[in-house]
Amino acid sequence: MAEEVPVSNVEEWKPRTKIGQLVKEGKITSIKELYARNMSIAEPEIIDVLLPNMKYEVIDIGMVQKQTDAGELSRYKVLVVMGNYDGYVSIGVGKSKQLRVAIQKAIRDAKMHVIPVRRGCGSWECTCGESHSLPFLVSGKSGSAEVVLRPAPKGTGLVAGGVLKTLLTYAGIKDVWSFSRGETRTTDNFIMAGYRALYNTYKFVTPVDWARRR
């Protein structure tokens, strides 16, 4: 179930980076401007300011063990998906002995890895021109898992399973066909492969991009 992403007190925020300072001073006012300048998200508070209406969902909770001098130490490992249902999405991982703290760390990690997702109407079966799907076929890999996302006509829905469907929903994609190969039973690799596929939507230069550069 989607929940509101906790937002820090921006008034008390003391930026540690130049980018953070520009955001707090109001010299960067949109997330699009940040990516247009090829700047990275160096502090989670940047997302609190530029994308304040994000939602998140815990998609996996596991236990990890670490061998120490005092014996075996067990911690929670939490995986979350975060997005605004309108072209921005992220995933994050957090570990801690306390579940609540692990979730907080995962949310913070997700804020540092928000990416823009290019949407469009790339299916030859659809000519509506709306941003309901992807503009072209993309793929992503993580470990032995590979995810391929193909544009689908309007009304198809998300032909994807499990956590991948959740990721696409938070990104604001409504229609897509998905294919997967390799070891997809591991949630971490499967969701990361999907995340990298969405990241690749901005790795290709479209005719519109060429026209803008002229």
Swiss-Prot record:
Keywords assigned: Ribonucleoprotein, Ribosomal protein, RNA-binding, rRNA-binding
GO cellular component, one term: cytosolic small ribosomal subunit
MF term (GO), any: structural constituent of ribosome
Keyword rRNA-binding: yes
Pfam families recorded: Ribosomal_S5, Ribosomal_S5_C
Disulfide bonds: none
Listed PROSITE patterns: RIBOSOMAL_S5, S5_DSRBD
Location of the S5 DRBM domain: 54-117
Signal listed as a keyword: no
InterPro entries: Ribosomal_Su5_D2-typ_SF, Ribosomal_uS5, Ribosomal_uS5_arc, Ribosomal_uS5_C, Ribosomal_uS5_euk/arc, Ribosomal_uS5_N, Ribosomal_uS5_N_CS, Ribsml_uS5_D2-typ_fold_subgr
GO biological process: translation
Note on domains (UniProt): The N-terminal domain interacts with the head of the 30S subunit; the C-terminal domain interacts with the body and contacts protein S4. The interaction surface between S4 and S5 is involved in control of translational fidelity.
Stated role: With S4 and S12 plays an important role in translational accuracy.
Family membership: Belongs to the universal ribosomal protein uS5 family.
Subunit structure: Part of the 30S ribosomal subunit. Contacts protein S4.
Protein name: Small ribosomal subunit protein uS5
Record organism: Metallosphaera sedula (strain ATCC 51363 / DSM 5348 / JCM 9185 / NBRC 15509 / TH2)
Primary gene name: rps5
